[in-house]
Every structure is written in C-alpha cells, then in structure tokens.
C-alpha cells in the first residue's frame, strides 16, 4: 500500500531512539499518521516543523498499519513567521485545531485548500479576518456551521444582530427582544465586514463558543488546544498596543 501527496505537518512526536511519528493533513487522505525513520535527528529537525508543507510518500504492508513516511520539504512556514508572534500563534492554532478536530483518514479537500490559503497568508494584511473565516469553515465541515442568512425566528434578512448559542442561527434585533442578553452578538467580522481588530476578536469569541460547547463535546469533551487561546491572547495584546 502506498500513496504520495503534499501535506501540512500538524504534529510531531518522538518514536523510539531516532524516529518520529508525524501527523499530516492532505487533501485526499485527511489526517494521516506515519513513522519517519530518523525523524528525531538534527538533520530532519528543520523539515519536521509544525505547519511545514511536505511532499510525502506513505507506505505500509497493510492499509490499517501506521506505515512509514519519506518526506521532502516543499515550504517551511514557521521560520517565515518566526519574528511575528501573532502570525506564529496563528500557525500553531490552525495546526492544533485540525489535529484536535479531524478524524483520521477522512478526506476534507475543501478544508485542505482553505487551510493552505490561510497559512500562506499568515502575517499579511487582514490575515486575522481570514483566520476567523477558516474557523467558521472548520465548524461547517464538522457539522456545526453558523447560519447567518436569515433570522431563525422570523425569516427576515435585515438587522441581524445576534446568534443563538444553541443553534448557531442568526436572530434579528427585533426578534431578540428581552432575550438579547442570552444571545451571542453577531460581529460584522463573521460576515466578512470587520471594521477593526475588535470585531475580529468578537467573532472569534463566537466561533470559540461553538468549538468549546458543540464540537469539543462531540469529540469526548476534550479541552480545546491551548494554542488557540495563545492566539487570542496575542491578538488582544496587539489591540492594546495599537490603542496605547
């Protein structure tokens, strides 16, 4: 059994004295583990950096075996954003959330393409807004997507101001009424119209709610990866510095 594909390196852990087990995310194979012989060596360390894009060949005697990888570096991303702490935190968050969320060996070609785009845009203008859109796409792929097309209560499409924390559907200001304080605010950033970083943080609070209270329980109630909170903290510090 074998296949070859470009993949995004999500995680690396030591295996024995000299090898490593890596987790790759590819378009057609999904999240797929494999052993890299000699992966713990100094020679391989620059290749096996989380977020790197690798040309990988996987081989195993049987399809249900963990198998082994041979890899070549296509694009190393961590070194490119090493001087940008916020972008580096974004890289870590993307990889950690994918490893946390995706089942093994299930293909998500659309999410793979979107992930490549958001990683390639790290540090660019409006990348944080693109990251928010990526989290929304992840929720959709996992079956917990937001529906911001119309009010869940009345069907109107104007003056949508809130989101139901239970269903992820939009609610108009008029329909919310006295229940408004129990709903999540609909940040313009969730519709691609962020006015500034505060809107993006408000949007991430919404996606964070659904990641923590809907997705995580479906995966055995595991806590969200700490890397995501480190990104939120980094973005908040950036806002504070910008306003000082």
Swiss-Prot record:
Disulphide connectivity of cysteines: none
A biological process term (GO) from this entry: double-strand break repair
The organism's place on the tree of life at top rank: Bacteria
Signal peptide boundaries: none
HAMAP family xref list: RecO
Similarity section: Belongs to the RecO family.
UniProt-recorded name of the protein: DNA repair protein RecO
Species: Jannaschia sp. (strain CCS1)
């Amino acid at each position: 059994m074998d296949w070859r594909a470009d993949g995004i390196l999500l995680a690396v852990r030591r295996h024995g004295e000299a090898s490593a087990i890596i987790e790759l995310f590819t378009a057609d194979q999904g999240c797929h583990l494999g052993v890299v012989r000699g992966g713990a060596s100094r020679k391989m360390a620059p290749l096996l950096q989380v977020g790197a894009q690798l040309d990988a060949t996987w081989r195993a005697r049987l399809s249900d075996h963990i198998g082994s990888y041979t890899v070549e570096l296509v694009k190393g991303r961590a070194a490119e954003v090493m001087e940008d702490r916020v972008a580096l935190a974004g890289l870590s968050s993307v990889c950690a959330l994918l490893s946390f969320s995706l089942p093994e060996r299930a293909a998500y070609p659309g999410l793979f393409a979107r992930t490549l785009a958001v990683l390639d845009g790290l540090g660019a203008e409006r990348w944080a807004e693109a990251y928010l859109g990526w989290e929304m796409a992840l929720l959709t792929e996992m079956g917990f997507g937001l529906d911001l097309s119309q009010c869940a209560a009345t069907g109107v499409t104007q003056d949508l101001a809130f989101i139901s924390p239970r269903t992820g559907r939009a609610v108009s200001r008029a329909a919310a009424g006295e229940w408004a304080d129990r709903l999540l605010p609909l940040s313009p950033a969730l519709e691609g119209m962020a006015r500034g970083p505060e809107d993006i943080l408000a949007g991430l609070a919404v996606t964070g709610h659904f990641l923590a209270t809907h997705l995580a329980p479906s995966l055995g109630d595991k806590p969200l990866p700490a890397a995501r909170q480190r990104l939120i903290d980094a973005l908040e510090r950036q806002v504070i510095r910008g306003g000082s």
